[in-house]
């Protein structure tokens, strides 16, 4: 009788909390994917996280390693590792694509695009088959082009396909701002728009602030320019130091974005999204500030950019468009609806 009473009270408590089991799939159990799964679990973003990889045993091993920290860290999320069996990712609320290969010596941009597009195509076909209602978060590089390809391949509405890059770039921008100001990094605001790449991103220094005070009134112009340059080569700086691409901040960025979706937090986050006239850009996927909630992209925010900033965005869009056009030339969009 006592057990039955406790059970019923538990059900009532869960109902009062509007409890809803959530499932997130992370494709790619490399450094970025595994870190994302780990942070998602620690922050209890979802009830279940599925980590999937093509390499035999890799995802299982990473998932087991994460789960063996559960009692130490204190999380209840279940992390499962899977080798290439997408049926176990079925009914995911959010799917994250981190899989892809880095550019190798002697590899052309077109070759890298072709290789990663094939990987993304295979992944997307499996994910959409088993989780047709999911929101897609793309991290694979070149990120803007892979997000654009994912949107075209799935045929999903644009609010359900999101590229993660701008969030990571903005986090790096705020780091360099806080270092220059000598202040708490949580008190700094900064945003990066444009393409995800050291030549295409646009750290918006004019909008940067410390506790609401414009950074332009706190730092000399040359120092701000130094911060902008450091931000733009932030990824390359880490690659040089680490000998490989960064993974901790990218993994945490994924968790931050997914949490805003799953928990309907309506956070303002710069992401790569498909534009249909916003900022004077059409039929292109590029980074702009958006509100992220349960439906994915809830709203695209129109910033009051000046002439110089708009020109930089157009220049960035041109570079991003070249990648997207290359995918068309390579025949990748011929797969759509086939």
Give the residues covered by each predicted segment.
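Conserved N-terminal Rossmann-fold NAD(P) cofactor-binding segment
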Residues: 54-92, 325-332
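C-terminal substrate-binding/catalytic lobe of Rossmann-fold NAD(P)-dependent dehydrogenases
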Residues: 154-160, 168-338
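N-terminal Rossmann-fold NAD(P) dinucleotide-binding loop
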Residues: 33-34
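Rossmann-like NAD(P)-binding element
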Residues: 71-134
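Glycine-rich Rossmann-fold phosphate-binding loop(s) that bind the pyrophosphate
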Residues: 29-30
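Rossmann-like NAD(P)(H) cofactor-binding subdomain of soluble oxidoreductases
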Residues: 108-174
């Amino acid at each position: 009788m006592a057990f039955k009473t406790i059970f019923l009270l538990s059900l009532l408590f869960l109902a009062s909390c509007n409890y809803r089991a959530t499932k997130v799939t992370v494709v790619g159990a490399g450094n970025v994917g595994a870190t994302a799964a780990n942070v998602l679990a620690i922050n209890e973003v979802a009830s279940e996280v599925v980590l999937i990889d093509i390499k035999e045993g890799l995802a299982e091993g990473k998932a087991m390693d994460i789960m063996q920290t559960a009692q130490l860290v204190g999380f209840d999320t279940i992390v499962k590792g899977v080798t290439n069996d997408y049926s176990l990712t079925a009914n995911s609320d959010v799917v994250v694509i981190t899989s892809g290969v880095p550019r190798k010596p002697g590899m052309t941009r077109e070759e890298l695009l072709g290789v990663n597009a094939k990987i993304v195509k295979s992944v997307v076909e499996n994910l959409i088959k088993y989780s047709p209602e999911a929101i897609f978060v793309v991290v694979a590089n070149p990120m803007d082009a892979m997000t654009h390809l994912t949107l075209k391949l799935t045929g999903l509405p644009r609010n359900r396909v999101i590229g993660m890059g701008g969030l990571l770039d903005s986090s790096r921008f705020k780091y360099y701002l806080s270092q220059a100001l000598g202040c708490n990094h949580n008190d700094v605001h900064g945003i990066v728009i444009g393409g995800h790449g050291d030549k295409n991103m646009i750290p918006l220094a004019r909008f940067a602030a410390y506790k609401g005070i414009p950074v332009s009134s706190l730092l000399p112009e040359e120092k701000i320019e130094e911060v902008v340059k450091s931000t733009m080569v932030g990824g390359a700086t880490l690659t040089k130091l680490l000998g490989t691409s960064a993974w901790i901040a990218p993994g945490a960025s994924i968790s931050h974005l997914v949490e805003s979706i799953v928990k309907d937090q309506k956070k303002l986050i710069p992401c790569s999204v498909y534009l249909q006239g916003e900022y004077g850009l059409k039929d292109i996927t590029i980074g702009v500030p958006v509100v992220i909630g349960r439906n994915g992209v809830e709203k695209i925010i129109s910033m009051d950019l000046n002439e110089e900033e708009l020109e930089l965005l157009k220049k960035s869009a041109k570079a991003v468009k070249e990648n997207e056009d290359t995918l068309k030339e390579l025949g990748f969009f011929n797969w759509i609806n086939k």
